[in-house]
């Protein structure tokens, strides 16, 4: 691996499999992180990305605040983080924390830092990756399982306060928060155990069904509610936008529970309830399915797992074809009925008789879903009622227009909120939290 020491987030890192690949890869690393020192590392395959959270003061004290697992990555950038680490043996994990503390002391580090490792499940061994000299965006994972406010600790450390006088760290070691007696931070047994398990998911403006290709554009709506088990934040809001030069991540969700499986379930619920509508695509549906896979639940994935799934073109499940067709026909027909109504009223406002060709009661919607063409006859049977006909079969639905431009469609006793977004390749439908595309018939 060729890696720029100033790089991060997937930038400034390349894998080379032969000497012939080195010159070109080296130039790419140089171009992505200009001026950075570049070093070569042995490639560790089938590894987990584990990291230890550190706090170090001005007096030579270093405390490790548990560990995190950040192995679910695409293009070397984290997508899912969790803590504490569950895949490594406790003795090995304790040794990793000890080495991390020793490293920080050896360079007289002060502040919050993360020491990152590549861990081999087969060998129960690990390799040093890097010391990240900053507070990382996934720090709430550690805060939730430890009760330690890491940014607040940074402020106190900068003021010269020793670690053993910081109330949160004293609580972590079972001490009186108001006390000042010394603490042996090398004695891991004195530290309270982690409080439950936390799963974190980065929300990115990427099309997960197209190799996590970045997307940009306006955001009409972001709907997410925090609760005692789930917390999240977003760097933009409805009415804002993600531009093409920004980092793809614009949100982060965290779910906590007593066990790892319960935390996964809490995150699944949170992702299903998350609603993001606009020109961008997001990874939320994809990750929701990803964390329910056998490999993730079984804790047997590695850092190359997600990239392999992308290469194998594993995509998210789409809405049932019949629901996509019905909702697609409803969206297309309501658009045409509204256009005809405007045209009809235009004639009346001019004192003219509207021509007979303007029908506000029937139309035909034709589109392609999953490479299949559908031609649906639509008849308006009431102010909010449509009858759809396809291949001799018919279905009645109730359609109500929403204030935000969406439709509330009632079908067979179930309600579906549907929004649409026009794109160069067709119409993107958001049915609840699932997405499908309506394409025009391809030219021969």
Language-model segments: what does each one mean?
Residues 382-385, 391-407, 412-416:
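Conserved nucleotide-binding/hydrolysis modules and their immediate coupling elements
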